[in-house]
């Protein structure tokens, strides 16, 4: 077996090649000890991309490293070697990650896009959601974990498979292909089904919100909003930052499972069944967080049909009709006065989502931020008492 090493920002990276059998393990342990002694480091990473085999003696060498090195991990492990780590329990006590499957995006059809990436069709049965923003790569692992756990909790979701290497430093998550259209697109193409589909959509929201969870994989939705306030406040006056804090204070913690971006393009219809997609924001919280995300699209996007279609699958006119239908059915009222009252609250929630976007971690945020701040100063901050009041009322009502 051969190995080489390099020091990168105090991380000692050791690359293995060949077979770590009994003879090789003794030699490797001795030589690596000298390398570690001669190169001051704060972390040790073993790159096992070219490691073909590991014997029990090799495992013991790895275990010694895990015990003596403060920040130790093994990356790019092939399937056969990873299975050894799994069977022996090493994968439970050491930070070990498998080599990612590689996908060539040039051979895939681009079928969608978003703030931090795009969606490509890998095959008839698989799509890959690619992240173009390396700063948020860590969120991909979180998204995969959330998608799998939500499925196990009984949430109707697209089945997630694995994390993949998409080339050029990009990572992605592979999902099953949903052979149908989104709820938004279905309503757009079948307006006569709007009422029926809205009923089913609300039933899916209620099903999701019937699930209580303490699983740490989901995290707190209020914490997510808190981070947005912290980021947004850097671009606002002190007084404006305090107004965002007023909204944050009115938003509750909770243990109810919420999607975080529950608009009609994030729910697909396949063989009559509605399935949630894009679950990176799924967290524990309160139904108002999903109502905020729905409200965000209920006026269309800047009265622009093309942009509105891209975001939620419907044109502006259809969105406005859907808004009326949704408000009546979600709040279970036919009273015109109550409908108008709830509609004004939806507008307040829409403004919250828009203004909190000042603190989003998206590639598009820097160019959009000046416009959002302008809108905030025209419509949000002057009406802060009304907006906070709407939040408090809905928190107690939902």
Task: Label each PLM-derived region with a short phrase.
Residues 110-216:
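ATP-binding pocket architecture of kinase catalytic cores
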Residues 337, 352-398:
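ATP/Mg2+ or Mg2+-diphosphate-binding catalytic cores
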Residues 111, 118-123, 245-289:
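Active-site acidic catalytic loop and adjacent metal/ATP-binding pocket
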Residues 1-30, 48-50:
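STAS-typified acidic loop motif
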Residues 210-260, 264-265, 270-271:
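An alpha-helical support segment within catalytic cores of ATP-dependent transferases
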Residues 291-334, 349-367:
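Active-site activation/catalytic loop segments of kinase-like enzymes and analogous catalytic loops
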Residues 22-94:
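Amphipathic alpha-helical interaction surfaces in cytosolic regulatory modules
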């Amino acid at each position: 077996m051969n190995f080489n090493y390099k020091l990168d920002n105090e991380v000692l990276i050791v690359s293995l090649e060949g077979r770590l059998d009994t003879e090789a393990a003794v030699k490797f342990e001795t030589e690596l000890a000298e390398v570690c002694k001669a190169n001051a480091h704060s972390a040790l990473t073993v790159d096992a991309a070219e490691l073909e085999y590991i014997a029990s003696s090799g495992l013991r060498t790895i275990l010694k490293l895990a015990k003596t090195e403060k920040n130790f991990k093994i990356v790019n492990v092939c399937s056969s070697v990873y299975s050894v780590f799994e069977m022996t329990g090493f994968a439970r006590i050491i930070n070990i990650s498998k080599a990612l499957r590689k996908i060539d995006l040039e051979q895939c059809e681009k079928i969608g896009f978003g703030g931090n990436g795009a969606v490509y069709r890998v095959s008839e049965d698989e799509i890959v959601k690619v992240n173009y923003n390396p700063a948020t790569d860590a969120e991909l692992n979180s998204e995969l974990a959330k998608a799998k756990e939500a499925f196990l909790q009984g949430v109707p979701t697209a089945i997630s498979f694995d994390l993949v290497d998409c080339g050029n430093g990009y990572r992605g998550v592979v999902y099953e292909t949903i052979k149908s259209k989104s709820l938004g697109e279905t309503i757009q193409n079948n307006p006569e089904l709007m009422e029926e589909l809205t009923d089913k959509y609300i039933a899916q929201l209620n099903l999701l919100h019937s699930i209580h969870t303490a699983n740490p994989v989901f995290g707190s939705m209020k914490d997510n909003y808190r981070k947005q306030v912290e980021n947004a406040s850097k671009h606002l006056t002190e007084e404006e930052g305090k107004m965002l804090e007023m909204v944050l204070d009115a938003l509750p913690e909770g243990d109810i499972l919420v999607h975080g971006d529950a608009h009609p393009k994030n729910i697909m219809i396949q063989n009559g069944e509605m399935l949630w997609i894009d679950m990176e924001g799924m967290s524990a919280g309160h139904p108002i967080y999903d109502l905020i995300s729905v409200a965000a699209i209920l006026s269309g996007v800047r009265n622009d049909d093309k942009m509105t279609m891209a975001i939620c699958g419907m044109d502006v006119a259809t969105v406005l009709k859907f808004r009326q239908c949704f408000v009546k059915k979600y709040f279970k009222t036919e009273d015109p006065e109550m409908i108008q009252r709830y509609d004004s609250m939806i507008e307040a929630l829409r403004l919250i989502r828009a203004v909190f976007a000042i603190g989003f971690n998206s590639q598009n945020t820097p160019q959009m931020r000046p416009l959002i701040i302008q809108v905030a100063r025209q419509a949000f901050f002057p009406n802060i008492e009304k907006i906070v009041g709407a939040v408090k009322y809905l928190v107690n009502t939902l």
